[in-house]
Protein backbone atom coordinates (compact mmCIF):
# COMPACT_ATOMS: atom_id res chain seq x y z
CA UNK A 1 0.00 0.00 0.00
CA UNK A 2 1.23 3.52 -0.71
CA UNK A 3 2.28 6.16 1.79
CA UNK A 4 0.15 9.30 2.02
CA UNK A 5 -0.08 12.46 4.10
CA UNK A 6 -3.22 14.40 4.92
CA UNK A 7 -3.94 17.59 6.78
CA UNK A 8 -7.26 17.78 8.61
CA UNK A 9 -9.10 20.42 10.59
CA UNK A 10 -11.41 19.17 13.33
CA UNK A 11 -14.18 21.50 14.54
CA UNK A 12 -16.44 21.34 17.58
CA UNK A 13 -15.59 20.95 21.26
CA UNK A 14 -12.07 19.70 20.62
CA UNK A 15 -9.86 21.91 22.80
CA UNK A 16 -9.41 21.43 26.54
CA UNK A 17 -10.76 17.87 26.39
CA UNK A 18 -7.58 15.85 25.72
CA UNK A 19 -8.27 15.66 22.00
CA UNK A 20 -4.66 16.14 20.85
CA UNK A 21 -3.33 13.56 23.29
CA UNK A 22 -5.83 10.86 22.38
CA UNK A 23 -5.27 11.64 18.69
CA UNK A 24 -1.54 11.17 19.28
CA UNK A 25 -2.18 7.84 21.02
CA UNK A 26 -4.43 6.62 18.19
CA UNK A 27 -2.01 7.79 15.48
CA UNK A 28 0.95 6.06 17.15
CA UNK A 29 -1.12 2.89 17.56
CA UNK A 30 -1.71 3.00 13.80
CA UNK A 31 2.00 3.60 13.07
CA UNK A 32 1.51 7.14 11.74
CA UNK A 33 3.71 10.22 11.94
CA UNK A 34 2.61 13.86 12.05
CA UNK A 35 1.18 16.16 14.67
CA UNK A 36 -1.92 17.59 16.32
CA UNK A 37 -2.11 21.26 17.28
CA UNK A 38 -4.69 23.69 18.62
CA UNK A 39 -5.62 26.60 16.37
CA UNK A 40 -6.77 30.04 17.47
CA UNK A 41 -10.30 29.48 16.08
CA UNK A 42 -10.92 26.61 18.54
CA UNK A 43 -10.27 23.81 16.06
CA UNK A 44 -7.48 21.24 16.00
CA UNK A 45 -5.17 20.75 13.02
CA UNK A 46 -4.01 17.18 12.43
CA UNK A 47 -1.30 16.10 9.99
CA UNK A 48 -1.02 12.34 9.54
CA UNK A 49 1.40 10.43 7.31
CA UNK A 50 1.74 6.70 6.76
CA UNK A 51 0.18 3.76 4.97
CA UNK A 52 -2.97 4.85 3.17
CA UNK A 53 -5.21 2.36 5.00
CA UNK A 54 -3.92 3.45 8.40
CA UNK A 55 -4.40 7.15 7.59
CA UNK A 56 -7.97 6.32 6.53
CA UNK A 57 -8.54 4.57 9.88
CA UNK A 58 -7.40 7.69 11.75
CA UNK A 59 -9.71 9.84 9.62
CA UNK A 60 -12.63 7.53 10.41
CA UNK A 61 -11.75 7.76 14.11
CA UNK A 62 -11.66 11.58 13.92
CA UNK A 63 -14.98 11.72 12.05
CA UNK A 64 -16.62 9.34 14.52
CA UNK A 65 -15.91 11.81 17.32
CA UNK A 66 -12.43 11.05 18.61
CA UNK A 67 -12.24 10.78 22.41
CA UNK A 68 -15.44 10.53 24.46
CA UNK A 69 -14.91 13.96 26.01
CA UNK A 70 -14.92 15.69 22.61
CA UNK A 71 -17.88 16.72 20.46
CA UNK A 72 -16.76 16.72 16.83
CA UNK A 73 -19.03 18.74 14.55
CA UNK A 74 -17.09 18.40 11.30
CA UNK A 75 -13.77 17.32 9.86
CA UNK A 76 -12.26 18.78 6.70
CA UNK A 77 -9.19 17.24 5.09
CA UNK A 78 -7.01 17.36 2.01
CA UNK A 79 -3.78 15.78 0.76
CA UNK A 80 -0.67 17.31 2.30
CA UNK A 81 3.01 17.51 1.39
CA UNK A 82 4.98 18.39 4.55
CA UNK A 83 8.04 20.56 4.05
CA UNK A 84 10.18 18.37 6.32
CA UNK A 85 10.44 14.76 7.42
CA UNK A 86 8.00 13.74 10.15
CA UNK A 87 9.57 10.98 12.26
CA UNK A 88 7.06 10.74 15.12
CA UNK A 89 3.54 11.89 16.00
CA UNK A 90 3.77 14.96 18.21
CA UNK A 91 1.66 17.48 20.05
CA UNK A 92 2.33 21.04 18.93
From Swiss-Prot:
Optimum pH is 5.2-6.5. GO terms for biological process: response to heat. This is Acylphosphatase. It is an enzyme of class 3 (hydrolase). Belongs to the acylphosphatase family. GO terms for molecular function: acylphosphatase activity. The gene is yccX. It comes from the Bacteria. It comes from Escherichia coli (strain K12). Its EC number is 3.6.1.7. Keywords: Disulfide bond, Hydrolase. PANTHER family: ACYLPHOSPHATASE.
Amino acid sequence: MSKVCIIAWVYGRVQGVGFRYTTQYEAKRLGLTGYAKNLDDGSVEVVACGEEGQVEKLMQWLKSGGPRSARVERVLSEPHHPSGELTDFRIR
